[in-house]
Amino acid sequence: MATSSHLLPQALHMIPRTPSFSSKNLGVSSILPRASSVNSRLSVSRVFLNHSSSNFGFAIDSKKRKEFIAKAEESTEGETEAVVENAVETEAEGEGEATVAAEEAKPPWKTRVKLGDIMGLLNKKAIEVAETVRPVPGLRTGDIVEIKLEVPENKRRLSIYKGIVMSRQNAGIHTTIRIRRIIAGIGVEIVFPIYSPNIKEIKVVSHRKVRRARLYYLRDKLPRLSTFK
């Protein structure tokens, strides 16, 4: 009994200690889940931050990719435009060189000679030849001239015609003059080609000053205006 009486107070004295110990243990155990919950929250927040940072990084990467793609497209467009411009310039240079080469290869342009020019040259040469054979004096309207003409029907005898020059018709080698004279009271007009080979000599007797190029009015005037010694 003594032992039991001694044991009971000890047991009673030991019982509250165990609850305190248990309470301490419970306190530690209660602290541990709180720490674990805090750690879990921190881990969750870290995961969320990591996830958000990864999303933000992905957004930044996507923006950078878009900008890089846009820059690449711009660079490719600029390169294509530069290539097209270079191709156009090379084509223009090639065309210019081709035109220059074609112009150099072409023979020099020859001036076209018209039929009228040819006839003028022929008349000029014929006049030069006729003047070398027989010189022709300067004949003007109003001059009194003396012409020695060879008539084939008259056995090549020379006939002398004298008169006043009424007009002159310039036609190259076919230039003619019209001479007027009064014969037996009648006015006679004769046309002579001055470069004809049948005319052997043309001599200017005298010069008269007149105001007109053609003296056709002498037909209506008195015969004394058309007579001379």
UniProtKB/Swiss-Prot annotation:
GO terms for biological process: translation. Coiled coil: none annotated. GO terms for cellular component: chloroplast; chloroplast envelope; chloroplast stroma; plastid; ribonucleoprotein complex; ribosome. InterPro entries: Ribosomal_bL19 (IPR001857), Ribosomal_bL19_sf (IPR038657), Translation_prot_SH3-like_sf (IPR008991). Pfam families: Ribosomal_L19. Signal peptide: none annotated. Part of the 50S ribosomal subunit. Belongs to the bacterial ribosomal protein bL19 family. This is Large ribosomal subunit protein bL19cy.
